[in-house]
Each structure stands twice: as C-alpha cells, then as structure tokens.
C-alpha cells in the first residue's frame, strides 16, 4: 500500500514510546504478569510469556524487573491482580476503535477512557459495537531489507495469510491466524529472518481513509491520548491516512 501512512505511523509510535520509557516499562511488566498468570512461569511452555520477555529485553527492561513480574504473576510474591478487558468506541469520522486494557480497577479505567473520548470528539461504546469490524491476527514484524522469494517460502511454511513490505525496504509485516503465530515466528527465525516484534493484534476488515488534515489530526490525537493512559496496553483503529496528510500534520 505504497503512499499510505502505515509505516510512517509505526515509526512515529516507536519514537513516542522511546520518550515514554517509564510508561512502556510498566506496560511490559503488566504483560509479563498477565502472561505468567494465564500460562505459567516457564517461557519454554508459555509462548505469550516468551514473547513478552523478548519484547521486554529488546526495550532494555532490567532483568530483575522481568523476574519480579514473573514472580508476581506466579504468586511467588504479592502483586496487583490485573485482568484483561477490551473496550470499544468511536472516534471522529466514525473511526472504530478497540482498546485492550490490563487493569486492577475497572471503574478507574472506564472513567479515564470515557473522559479521553469525550474530550476528543469520540464516544466510548458498548461491548460489541465495533468488535465485529475487526479480526484477531498474529503479526510478525521483520527487520529489512529481505529477499521476497525467501520470505514467501518461509511465510508459507509458517502458515502465513499474507505480508506487507515497507515501501522503503525498512521492514515487513507478516500476518497469520492468531493461533499460528508461534509456528510462524519459528519458521521465520529458522529461515534466518530477524524478528523485530511479534504480537496478536486486532486488524480491521476495512479502513476509513482520512483525507482532511483537521479530521486526521483529531483522530490521531484521540488515539495518542488513549495510548497514553496507564491501563491501556494497545489501541487498534480502522483509520488510514495518506503520507502527505500525515506529513502536513507532523511537519
């Protein structure tokens, strides 16, 4: 999809995460706690935990913090009782938004989300109001450049549904069924590809293109403010912005 802002927005998100390192560390720790609680403390038999640890190490989360999060998740030491909750809503121009949260206080999380939506031209909706517009997919992000022929062979071996290459050759996203993510990452690593990230993500069936810079700015501001909330792990939306529009916003 050359000419669109997908990769530019990924790079902007990485830069924003670097600035908010403290918040990122907290999110990584929560994910390790929840992954341990759901699948046990042994990463060899808990793929989600293994991914969480790899992401934490890549972000330079100290080893003692990683172990402490595992201990909290396993009950070896006392910790907060986080639960995973999905929230749904609408942004400006009818953009559908899914929020994945990990919280120890539902009332606080809902109040924070509702405040951000209402202040930025959106509405927090009921469960199911936009979820039907998305599908859960496994996504493996590879460092570029890559040889496309080799990528296709490894991706097919791992059960991939498709792939998308950064127009500038700086990365590749390979998608699969959520349940096939472990097999896909194993196949890609086995073929010698460098894995930058892997996660299960909500992917929209269709996108709303935002050609008006003012509307696009309002939507992006809403998404950024949602992402900045302490309890929010990930935000997915069905918006699409041309590179030229994005550049005019962040120039």
From Swiss-Prot:
Keywords: Cytoplasm, DNA-binding, Transcription, Transcription regulation. PANTHER family: TRANSCRIPTIONAL REGULATORY PROTEIN YEBC-RELATED, TRANSLATIONAL ACTIVATOR OF CYTOCHROME C OXIDASE 1. Pfam families: TACO1_YebC_N, Transcrip_reg. The keyword Transcription applies. One of its GO terms (molecular function) is DNA binding. This is Probable transcriptional regulatory protein glr2507. Belongs to the TACO1 family. It comes from the Bacteria. GO terms for cellular component: cytosol. HAMAP family: Transcrip_reg_TACO1 (MF_00693). The keyword Phosphoprotein does not apply. SUPFAM superfamilies: YebC-like. Gene3D superfamilies: 1.10.10.200, 3.30.70.980. It is found in: Cytoplasm. GO terms for biological process: regulation of DNA-templated transcription.
């Amino acid at each position: 999809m050359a000419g669109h802002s997908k990769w530019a927005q990924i790079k902007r998100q990485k830069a924003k995460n670097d600035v908010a390192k403290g918040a990122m560390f907290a999110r990584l720790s929560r994910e390790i706690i929840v992954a341990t609680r759901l699948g046990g403390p042994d990463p060899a038999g808990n793929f989600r935990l293994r991914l969480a640890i790899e992401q934490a190490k890549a972000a330079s989360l100290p080893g003692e913090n990683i172990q402490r999060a595992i201990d909290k998740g396993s009950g070896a030491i006392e910790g907060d009782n986080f639960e995973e909750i999905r929230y749904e809503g609408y942004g400006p121009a009818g953009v559908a938004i899914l929020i994945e949260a990990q919280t120890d206080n539902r009332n606080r999380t809902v109040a924070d989300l509702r405040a951000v939506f209402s202040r930025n031209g959106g509405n927090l909706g009921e469960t199911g109001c936009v979820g039907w517009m998305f599908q859960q997919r496994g996504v493996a992000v590879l460092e570029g450049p890559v040889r496309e022929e080799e990528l296709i062979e490894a991706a097919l071996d791992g059960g991939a549904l498709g792939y998308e290459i950064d127009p500038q050759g700086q990365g590749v996203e390979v998608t699969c069924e959520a349940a096939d993510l472990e097999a896909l990452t194993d196949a890609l690593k086995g073929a010698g590809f460098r894995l930058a990230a892997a996660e299960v993500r909500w992917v929209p069936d269709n996108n709303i293109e935002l050609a008006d810079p003012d509307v696009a700015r309002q939507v992006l501001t809403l998404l950024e403010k949602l992402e900045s909330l302490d309890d929010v792990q990930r935000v997915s939306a069905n918006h699409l912005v041309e590179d030229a529009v994005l550049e005019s916003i962040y120039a």
